[in-house]
Amino acid sequence: MHSEYGSAYRNLFLNHWWWRAREEAIVGVLRERFQARPGARILDVGCGDGLFFDRLREFGEAEGVEPAEYLVDPLGPHRSRITIAPFDESFQPGGRYDLILMLDVLEHLDAPVVALRHAISLLEPHGLLLITVPAFNLIWTNHDRINQHRTRYTKASFRRIAEDAGIKILLARYLFFWLFPVKLAARAKESLLRPAPQVPQVPGRAINRFLFLLSRGEEKLSHLLPLPIGSSLLVMGSTPPPNS
């Protein structure tokens, strides 16, 4: 993540309609699919300053690992539960997790399969892995550049890396269908005007609220009519059963 983007991340996560709508979609899937229980262990990979920890309390005890030290407040309320380290084989927490989250993490990595294999190695036998990634390279924009993304995924391309990592996919769902043509238009505009990448801003209150409600309404409808495309992809997976 670009350092300028990182400095704005807290405000974006807490207030921007996109982050708020993504969080609600994630929580909704967890309520459907994850059996919350006292003492359940949750790992948030790429957790930043632990901004999602309070919401995860509904499902268990959250901790995190974050490679970018500048994103972690040394005096923050969750500092004791955050390990500043890369998410690779050197990260050995000494126990397994019931749920591992990788929220918009894999697109930053040169070796996503390696990271997925490590995540699977840290899961309990019946544990779950929940992942979000940006979708479709067709809508690659300056937003991807300032975020230092390596790629965007489709269901098919993600399924390939999941199979390589030994992950059984339980759910794959596109999010933000309405945003796809908007980003496609943004890409066309950028190809003509060549603007410099800029850190996103939180819109005005009315627009921010409208876009949040639009995204939430679309996500609820997607349970009845799956979205064929979207600007994000949400995946839930697990370790394959023995002898599969």
Model-derived segments and spans:
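A C-terminal cap/extension of S-adenosyl-L-methionine-dependent methyltransferases
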Residues: 4, 179-244
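A short glycine-rich, Lys/Arg-flanked "PGG" loop and its adjoining helix->strand segment in the class I
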Residues: 113-128
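Conserved S-adenosyl-L-methionine
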Residues: 167-177
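Feature marks short, surface-exposed loop/turn motifs that line or immediately flank catalytic pockets
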Residues: 71, 137-139, 178
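Conserved N-terminal segment of class I S-adenosyl-L-methionine
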Residues: 1-103, 113-116, 200, 205, ...
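Short, glycine-/aromatic-enriched active-site segment of Class I SAM-dependent methyltransferases
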Residues: 10-12, 129-151, 155-163
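A short His-aromatic
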Residues: 104, 108
